[in-house]
């Protein structure tokens, strides 16, 4: 069965939640006997790969302009999928889903994965938000099957579009943690094991990393001994499009002694997750955050905003703070630093990528009927 995937910037080693999702899922689909081709956006690709872990990679041009790169690339990708003779076109995210009707007009079977209402993201203006809402509508109304990554999204599309048939709740997953140390890297960053708060995500407004930096600033102003003791805030990530927000965030971080790692993967990231005091995700918008699940898989104490997507993870009440309340966040971080270093045994059973791949395979097989 030939599957063609679009709606992602690409794999491997490309920043983003959808990208991480695809990087984990589709090699597993190949292992299950599917012929998978994933179409990448040229401006994010830094390699000349044509295949990765069995997934065929086709790279086609796209304009690196956030307002319309996804839609133009998806149009080209659908035409490519038709040429390749796809049995199923799997479209990710609501922006690319705007073209689900076009794919249906070409006679294709379409699976649409809804990763979250992206029109809630702070970075989009009115026109972009309108197009994203239209994309959500087109995907939910015309795709043969819809995969949602949380109950929040499942309830959303039932309420807005009455879509309940062939809607499949399949969570994001997380891989087994790779517990490791990396003394040379820690020396380079100037940090110590167990003495840093970790923020790990893209530098975009809705992640609210500026709130985390401000909470850290308040913390060290109240207790200057924390600096003497070596406690720091580490932000792991970057942005696809350097803009006023990301530049301002980096400046704010540097002024407050925050460690900026840039976009990292592999041993560097694993060592930061292994040894952090806690992980913090203060965002105002999420689908089902893979970064949070990844931190949980390492048994890390977490502090997250109380938005619906984070609440669905089902953490203890004390792990949440009111979204946007910097004082409350700062207070919680202070208590975590004062308490003994914790290892938390979370139940990660429903976030197993192999189980997820089996469930996605069931969706594909249903299209044969």
Regions found by a protein language model. Give the residues of each.
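Membrane-proximal helix-turn-helix segments that form the acceptor-binding/catalytic region
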Residues: 79-82, 105, 129-146
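Nucleotide-activated donor-binding/catalytic signature segment of Leloir-type glycosyltransferases, i.e.
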Residues: 246-264
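Short His-centered aromatic/hydrophobic patch
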Residues: 91-96
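A short, active-site helix/loop in glycosyltransferases that binds the activated sugar's phosphate group
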Residues: 140-168, 174-176
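Conserved acidic donor-binding segment of nucleotide-sugar-dependent glycosyltransferases
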Residues: 318-327, 334-339
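Conserved donor-binding/catalytic core segment of Leloir-type glycosyltransferases
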Residues: 4-6, 190-217
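Short hydrophobic beta-strand element within catalytic cores of glycosyltransferases
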Residues: 297, 301-304
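Aromatic "clamp/platform" in nucleotide-sugar-dependent glycosyltransferases that forms part
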Residues: 284
């Amino acid at each position: 069965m030939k599957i063609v995937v679009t709606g992602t910037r690409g794999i491997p080693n490309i920043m983003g939640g959808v990208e991480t999702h695809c990087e984990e899922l589709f090699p597993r689909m190949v292992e299950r006997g599917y012929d998978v081709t994933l179409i990448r956006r040229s401006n994010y690709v830094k390699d000349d790969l044509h295949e990765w872990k069995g997934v065929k990679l086709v790279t086609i041009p796209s304009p690196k302009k956030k307002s319309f790169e996804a839609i133009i690339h998806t149009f080209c990708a659908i035409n490519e999928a038709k040429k390749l003779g796809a049995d199923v076109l799997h479209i990710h995210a609501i922006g690319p889903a705007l073209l689900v009707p076009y794919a249906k007009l070409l006679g294709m079977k379409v699976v649409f994965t809804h990763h979250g209402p992206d029109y809630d993201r702070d970075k989009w203006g009115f026109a972009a938000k309108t197009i994203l809402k239209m994309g959500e509508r087109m995907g939910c109304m015309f795709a043969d099957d819809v995969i949602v990554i949380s109950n929040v999204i499942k309830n959303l599309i039932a309420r807005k579009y009455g879509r309940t048939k062939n809607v499949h709740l399949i969570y994001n997953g997380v891989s087994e943690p790779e517990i490791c140390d990396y003394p040379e890297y820690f020396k380079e960053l100037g940090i110590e094991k167990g003495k840093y708060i970790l923020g790990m995500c893209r530098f975009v407004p809705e992640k609210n990393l500026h709130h985390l930096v401000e909470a850290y600033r308040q913390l060290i102003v109240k207790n200057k001994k924390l600096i003497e003791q070596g406690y720091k805030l580490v932000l792991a990530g970057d942005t696809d499009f350097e803009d006023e927000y990301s530049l301002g965030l980096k400046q704010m971080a540097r002024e407050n002694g925050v460690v900026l790692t840039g976009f990292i993967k592999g041993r560097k990231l694993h060592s930061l997750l292994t040894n952090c005091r806690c992980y913090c995700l203060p965002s105002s918008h999420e689908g089902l955050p893979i970064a949070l699940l990844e931190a949980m898989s390492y048994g890390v104490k977490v502090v997250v905003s109380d938005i619906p997507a984070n609440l669905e993870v089902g953490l203890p009440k004390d792990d949440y703070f009111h979204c946007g309340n910097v004082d409350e966040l700062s207070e919680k971080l202070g208590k975590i630093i004062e308490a003994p270093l914790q290892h938390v045994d979370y139940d990660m059973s429903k976030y197993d990528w192999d189980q997820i791949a089996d469930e996605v395979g069931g969706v594909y097989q249903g299209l044969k009927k």
